[in-house]
Regions:
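N-terminal Rossmann-like NAD(P)+-binding subdomain of aldehyde/semialdehyde dehydrogenases
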Residues: 1-115, 152, 166-170
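PLP-dependent aminotransferase-like
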Residues: 132, 144-172
Length: 172
């Protein structure tokens, strides 16, 4: 059911991607043909759609009995801190955002041997407790609010309330 909802969200987001990017461009006073409008594509529909696809792949892996991080490179820093290298994952990402890397530095006590015990915890519970989260939409990157919402829904299994700031009204 969750994968089906992600598929529907991906489809609808693709349908409205241009409108979404153009709304951000207009809200920031940029011309649609300005090179700077590309930031609205990268920081809006692209970032959101990319995350949705990764979440879909993660849910499929979990459903198949695999680790949620089975494709993530794990290493240790010189001080012993465990690091998960989560971006880029493929040639397109390397080319699109050259020299842009995303590493997650784990808390003390998390090691390459026990990192699996710390991820996808919601999906390891037999009967998870219901929770409600409040997302405050106040940023100037248009994908942040939907990413926060979907993270809470999918990674933590929480219901979400959202409060948008007036300057983000264009996001609907």
């Amino acid at each position: 059911e969750k994968i089906n909802f992600l598929d529907q969200t991906i489809k609808r987001s693709v349908e409205f991607a241009e409108e979404w990017a153009n709304a951000g461009t207009e809200a920031k006073g940029l011309s649609a043909d300005s090179p700077l409008s590309g930031e609205e594509w990268l920081g809006g529909p692209y970032a959101f759609l990319n995350w949705l696809q990764y979440m879909k792949n993660t849910l499929k892996a979990i459903g198949a009995g695999k680790s949620a991080i089975h494709k993530v490179k794990i290493s240790e820093r010189s001080n012993g801190q465990t690091v998960a290298h989560v971006y880029p994952n493929n040639l397109l990402e390397k080319l699109l955002l050259d020299n842009y890397y995303l590493d997650v530095w784990m808390q003390e006590g998390v090691t390459p041997d026990n990192i699996e015990d710390t991820v996808a915890l919601f999906y390891k519970q037999d009967n998870p407790e219901g929770k409600v989260s409040l997302v405050l939409g106040a940023g100037n990157v248009s994908s942040i609010v939907p990413l926060d919402i979907f993270y809470k829904l999918y990674a933590e299994g929480e219901v979400v309330l959202i409060k948008m700031k007036p300057f983000n009204e264009y996001l609907g």
